[in-house]
Amino acid sequence: MLNEKKMRVKVDLHVHTVYSPDSSITLEQLVFWAKKRGLTGVAITDHDSVEGALKFARETDFLIIPGTEVNSRDGHVVALNVREVIPKGLSAEETVERIHVVGGVAVACHPFALFKGSLGRHASSKFDAVETINASASPFKRSLRKAEAIAARFKLPRVAGTDAHYAPAIGLAYTVVAAEPNVDAVVKAIANGRCQPFGESVPLRLKLAKYFHYFK
């Protein structure tokens, strides 16, 4: 939680780009919509890849937290502040260990959302944080409620992200972090619980627009 008078940043901690096969978001779109929504930064979390995150971070002064969404055999895991691919197909626990080995932070993302490769009972105290608000999760309120319960059970920090695959969704969920606006400070503050999630569900019209764009 936020209870200190320090600099605060506003970051969407779960965004996909054109380096994910199911996303259409370019660097220009990402920066435009992030700034439009008043964000300080964005975590790029492409599926089993860090290529886009590293490339985009080199090409803009906007705060980009390099990450990836790892397809573990137990469900999806978001790794923040990693600069190499985490092998997919490992158990959730092994995935978290690999993330820690390379200095990253492991987030149990959308742990109870339907149709998203969610962790469910595999979310554990091994994680550094729980994504309690995922703007793309369905059913939204049920997912939020169950994720909150897991975070409380394991006494883990709570974060939020949109899981955006279509640019106008960026920033509909975000995390406010008590930290200086740089990658290491933000990620360290998240791991230490100096953060608070906010957000809403992606409107149906944006979800439909995403699929129209993808299949056209």
Task: State where each predicted segment sits.
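Divalent metal-dependent hydrolysis catalytic cores, especially in the metallo-beta-lactamase
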Residues: 30-48, 105-107
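Glycine-rich, histidine-containing beta strand-loop boundary motifs that form or position
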Residues: 46, 110, 162
